[in-house]
Amino acid sequence: MNKVSFQGVPGAYSESAAKKFFGEEIDAYGTDSFEDALNAADTKNSSDDYHCILPVENSIEGTVGQSIDAITNTNLHSIGEVYLKVEHCLIGRGKLDDVTKVYSHPQALGQCSDFIEDHDLKTVPTYDTAGSVEIIKDLEDNCAAIASSLASRLYDVPIIKEGIANNSNNFTRFLIFSRENTTESGNDKTSIIFSVKHEPGALNQILKEFNDNDINLTKIESRPNKNTNWEYNFFVDFVGHFSNDKIQLVLKNISKNVLFLKIIGSYPIADLD
């Protein structure tokens, strides 16, 4: 049975994504932070069937920055991706007119900002969507949470209103991590992180390498470098597997013009369904 660590508590969207990727029969383990989730799968006692799953991108709110920062420092390799349709519910013991305060993860609060504004609700950020249901279950009726219907069932707190996201076409992309690498499938994506010198044309030189070798970039995102003010790391996804000869040559050329380069991993491209 696959063991999967994730950030959050039972009922979190990450747990649902893990079950979508591995199947319902998994040994899921919730942690307090993205770093803890990665570390749980990277201990000496972790077996080959121990994985970690992290959200990296949402179709409405964009990149999950804390997750990307944690990935920068892990020794694990990304071996898969999965897309999960996110269907937010307002959960609480009161009626909609009773609710004045709503608890949830900042990403979920952002994804439901129109509903929150329309009902003039005060927001309380929490570390996890499902965890917010656990928090409000014993609070007054004016307190509610934004989470999944699964969290409502697990913590036995009623759904006040379903489908409260700004956009019903709301998907979150997750990456799956392991101590082992993957082999080339023929339909792969690779994720890397790098930092360039703070000088004119430095980033363009890297991007030109991809362009000259006809490699399709599917994502590029900058994140502040935590060690040096006003310098940035770049998180990049591109089509292809790092074991491919052409990809290896490009990565070798890139490595000559960056301050650091980390290959997060290569994995089969997931369908958006």
What residue ranges belong to the model's regions?
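Domain-level signature for soluble enzymes in the chorismate/prephenate branch of the shikimate pathway
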Residues: M1-D273
